[in-house]
């Protein structure tokens, strides 16, 4: 958590204002600091001791957020869609209320776009759906198109407190990965993002018609599926894999993170496999549960 220990934090807030609030069910990484920022005990198991001065608040509960803010809080960090937390999107009203409060009280807004960023939700950054302009944005995964890269975007206010060498990583800025990232960024034009949005609409419409689907969550091509009838997402995952479709799970939901280059034909093929799997499970499910 570079911002908590950065020159910006110390010179702007003083050494005693160094607490970061994150959300319950969040996931922010696997270093000790980002594990601490992660609001899920399951990821803390077998690690530690952890850095101090992090606090966890429930998502979409503005009153609890306000009650948690004291003179030690310098930043709040959020995922617009909690991926590892069940593919749950934050409420727009909650995000706006938090943003207004942070701006009024000089609290930095950090948005973790590692899963949601670089076109995943149909906009370059997911926070665009919320009309949110964070002070800091973290990126990785999609930025490299399969190559390992991470980036931190910041506004001028924060950047003024950073200097050459103040933060970095072993392979940060290496030319091969940056060349790959440049290709990815060049592809992120309006027509590319429009296709992502169109395929998301197609996918979600098809999923809603499938048997045993209770509800859908997420934004764009970041989709969570909850099932009726006691069907377990892990069982659906295994059955899909046998038929050639790779999916994930998150909490009790099936999680879909398809390639952003997918076509209408790809969507229909995936829907066909899911339909086969869920139809078979529906036939085996107790009638009173289905």
Q: Can you describe what each PLM-predicted range is?
A:
Residues 4-290:
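Conserved N-terminal phosphate-binding loop of PLP-dependent enzymes in the Aspartate aminotransferase
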Residues 1:
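Proteins enriched for Cys/Gly/acidic motifs involved in redox and nucleic-acid/cofactor modification
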